[in-house]
Amino acid sequence: MRIVVTGTDTGVGKTYVSAALCDERTTYVKAAQTGDDDDAATVRELSGATTHTLAHYPEPLSPERSAARAGVACITPREIADFVERLDGRVIIEGAGGLLVNFGAGTIADVAQLLGAPLIVVARAGLGTLNHTALTVEAIRHRGLECLGIVIGSWPADPDLAALCNLDDLQSIAPVLGKLPEGQAPKLEIPA
């Protein structure tokens, strides 16, 4: 099974959700890493998964922009999909930023389309998440892709009223599969 993990934005907890979906029998693929972070190392440390980062660009910008500023070609959705298609077993593919962030000649949504893979949307807990999440899920469905559901990637230790209400309201957009405590990656089971 292949699952693409995308988000409503950057910094929403995609890497922690990816780690929560992985174990030592899973392969994790970071399509493109930008800036100094090492999401694959985080996933490997938290889950024991085999990890691959397909492209790394120096500046924390969109993959396409960071690659251009570095004077190199950006990895494309076709290159990402070709790599993933050679892998066996459960594969978790994490994008960069949100669903429609550019990877050369396309987006992580195009990767999901090429692979025929469903997506999980990682969202924030607080105020503003309903609109961002609805737009992301609508874009997924508009492309004829499957959204398995939503995970709140960084549930606060002391949630405010907006976060508590959003947890219920997000269910009207897509199933809420879970909420991860800030900075943690407890195992997350996805219904088959």
Which functions belong to the PLM regions below?
Residues 7-9, 30-32, 54-55, 94-96, ...:
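Fold-independent oxyanion-binding glycine-rich loops
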Residues 4-19:
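Glycine-rich phosphate-binding P-loop
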Residues 20-22, 96-174, 178-179:
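Conserved catalytic-core segment of NTP-binding enzymes
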Residues 80-104:
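Switch II (G3) loop of P-loop NTPases
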Residues 16-74, 78, 82-89:
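N-terminal phosphate/diphosphate-binding loop that engages ATP/GTP or pyrophosphate donors
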Residues 1-5, 26, 89-93, 119:
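Generic beta-sheet signal
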Residues 57-60, 182-188:
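A short acidic, often aromatic-flanked loop/helix-cap motif at beta-alpha or helix-coil junctions
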